[in-house]
A protein has these predicted regions:
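Thiamine diphosphate
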Residues: 1, 6, 21, 25, ...
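Structural signal for short hydrophobic segments within the conserved structured cores
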Residues: 12-14, 172
């Protein structure tokens, strides 16, 4: 179903992992669905119980959540690796990140709340000659040009596999390809 959210015209899809992300998305969604140029909002939620972080989100982080993604664990400049995760698999992504930084210091953990918003913004930038200003491009900018990305979600891996096209990073897309 993440691919439906990614490809359906007039539908903005989100898959938050944490309740504070959901709150930021709700605020935006209520304005969006009532706007003259707005549209429908699809929230892909899970019944899986997740430990919730205790944090106060900055206005910048709330905006990034609505724009489609933010760094839960920012990479160091020139980092060799980033885990890119969406939805309830964040628990496994956090655990993997904690193990990986022992061997690959500086690796980042990127949370994707809306693959579609990230992709739409990036494609618009590519088509208008300003792809470097796309939110996803700015998110990936700290990584080494040779960095690898491991994408993970509980949906089809192609939902996030396109991240490799943004800055020509290698991608290992993980997810559910058959069910």
């Amino acid at each position: 179903t993440p691919l439906i959210g990614l490809g359906q015209s007039g539908l903005t899809a989100f898959e938050p992992a944490y309740v504070d992300e959901l709150a930021a998305i709700f605020r935006w969604s209520f304005e969006h669905i009532q706007a003259d140029d707005g549209g429908a909002v699809y929230l892909r939620l899970s019944t899986r119980s997740l430990n919730q972080p205790t944090r106060d989100l900055s206005a910048e982080t709330r905006a990034q959540i609505v724009d489609g993604g933010y760094w839960l664990e920012p990479p160091t400049p020139g980092a060799e690796l980033a885990i890119v995760a969406s939805g309830p698999v964040i628990t496994e992504a956090v655990e993997a990140h904690q193990q990986i930084v022992e061997d690959i210091p500086g690796a980042g953990l990127l949370v994707v709340t809306s693959p579609g918003r990230l992709q739409d913004d990036w494609i618009e930038g590519v088509n208008n000659g300003r792809s470097e200003r796309a939110h996803v491009r700015r998110l990936l900018a700290p990584l080494s040009p040779d960095a690898g990305l491991v994408t993970i979600l509980d949906g089809h891996p192609s939902t996030l596999a396109w991240f490799g096209s943004v800055a020509r990073h290698r991608v290992a897309p993980l997810g559910v390809s058959r069910f």
